[in-house]
Amino acid sequence: IQVDSVCNEVIVPAPNLAPDIAESARRAALTIASELGVTGVMAAELFETPGRGPGFLINELAMRPHNSGHWTQDGSVTSQFEQHLRAVLDLPLGSTDRVAEATVMKNVLGGENQNLYGAFPEVMAAYPEAKVHLYGKSVRPGRKVGHVNVTGPSESIDRLRQVANEAAAVIRDHGAAENA
């Protein structure tokens, strides 16, 4: 889910995505990777376009682990980072099976809070199911500085989204009132 042309949230599996469009997108990505001779992870960021062409547009190709695949750190048996290393080192690839029915990844964008790690105790106490990953980058408003993953049953997708969004907001806004 994009907001202001920035990846804001990833929901796995994609809700309400028609199986034929998912299969067509999978085939297109595999064809592109094969034709380009890709070794390692290739992310194909797609936008669904119901009723137009194949039902999707390719927005971005990245020949590396990508923000849209960060959900794999907690939602897949093998993360995109480990899978990339396995591929480039010519090791057997790991399982791509999901460890839960659904995963929500919410990006943490920089705000006024400069001490992102100061929010950890609050997030861990309020949202024990949220897994926080911070990148160690300097904080600037709107810059991706981390993400939150939450996994669970697919029938709880609304709750997973709520937890991911609230946890990310706590990190972004922690201490903002004292800094104002």
What are these model-derived regions, one by one?
Residues 17, 72-77, 159:
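Short alpha-helix boundary/capping segments
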Residues 27, 31, 82, 162-165:
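A broad detector of short, well-ordered amphipathic alpha-helices
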Residues 45, 77, 100-101:
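Sparse recognition of residues in long alpha-helices and their boundaries
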Residues 73-91:
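C-terminal structural cap/anchor segments
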Residues 86-180:
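Peripheral (often C-terminal) accessory segments that flank ATP-dependent C-N-forming ligase machineries
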